[in-house]
Regions:
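Residue-level detector of functional hotspots within protein domains
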Residues: 55-58, 73, 124, 170, ...
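Intrinsically disordered, low-complexity acidic/Ser/Thr-rich segments used as protein-protein interaction/activation
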Residues: 118, 169-173
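Repeat-mediated protein-protein interaction surfaces in helical alpha-solenoids
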Residues: 161-169
């Protein structure tokens, strides 16, 4: 069973290249964080990716356990990098850079290399965050169709199952498939990027053909990774389930999730009661 997602919370979009952000031209006056992405096997960086010697380097390491069907007996990690001025748009990374500089044995060295470790971050999501910091959007871009007066995702369409292509990721920490934009939203919450939260919510509303199981696992992820006073993403899922209730009430996954319980389903009960009250008020006003 599938449900469509609804377009919500408009936000201004900035122009971006659809290519990888590591190809961006950066003024030499900006301090540089290496823009290589590679498997973490040593402290070295490929020669072609080495920055100018007079610029300092920052690197961000993420890690996750390699799947068992892969032929690697060790934990896989990836090295990301970015320019300091760009990274510090995020209050989280600005504070992390300050701490890293303070802890560096030679903070004034022009050739220093400072690492920021994010062991709990999914590499695919951090890639979206960095791309947004450089480009104001992340792939696929949200494009405004002036003819139809609607927003669209660039170069996307339904797959063989009718679901928007590349709408989901497998989240290794939870062991479930979730909507990528939900993970980006939660990461933006963590890193203090309010415009990115609005962008991720809008892009999530442009997907279609999403499985009920994916919506429910994404909703649980949203509840687990946002504060209790968060009013956008959580409300989006509650409204979606209520709007598509005829589909969800036939879903075996919905039954299993409700039996597990959690704050999501109490909020859903309250939202459903409010919805019924609104319908009753609207009906009485027409009488």
């Amino acid at each position: 069973m599938v449900c469509a997602l609804e377009d919500v919370d408009p936000t201004a979009q900035q122009e971006q290249s659809k290519h990888a952000f590591h190809r961006t031209t950066i003024p030499e006056s900006r301090r540089q964080l290496v823009l290589a992405i590679s498997h973490w096997k040593s402290d070295s960086v490929p020669e072609s990716e080495e920055p100018c010697p007079r610029l300092s380097k920052y690197s961000i390491a993420t890690s996750r356990k390699t799947p068992k069907n892969r032929h690697f007996p060790y934990q896989e990690a990836r090295l990301f990098a970015a320019h300091e001025a760009t990274l510090c748009i995020s209050p989280f990374f600005a504070a992390a850079c300050c701490r890293a500089q303070a802890q560096s044995p030679s903070p004034d060295s022009p050739n220093k290399r400072i690492s920021i470790s994010l062991p709990d971050e999914q590499p695919e999501i951090l890639s979206c965050i960095l791309e947004y910091l450089y480009k104001g959007d992340y792939t696929p871009r949200a494009i405004y169709n002036r003819h139809r007066e609607t927003w669209e995702l660039e170069n996307t369409g339904p797959d063989t199952n009718g679901q928007t292509t590349n709408a989901t990721i497998f989240h290794h920490a939870t062991g479930s498939v979730i909507l990528r934009d939900t993970a980006v939203y939660c990461a933006a919450q963590k890193y203090g990027l309010e415009p990115l939260k609005r962008l991720a919510l809008r892009k999530q509303g442009l997907h279609s053909g999403i499985q009920c199981s994916t919506i429910l696992s994404s909703a649980r992820y949203a509840y687990a990774n946002t504060p209790d006073d968060e009013s956008k993403l959580r409300a989006h899922y509650l409204a979606l389930i209520i709007r598509c209730r005829s589909t969800f009430k036939r879903s075996g996954t919905m039954q299993m999730e409700m039996e597990k319980g959690g704050k999501l389903f109490f909020d859903l009960f309250v939202a459903m009661c409010n919805h019924m009250d609104d319908l009753a008020i609207a009906k009485s006003s027409l009488a």
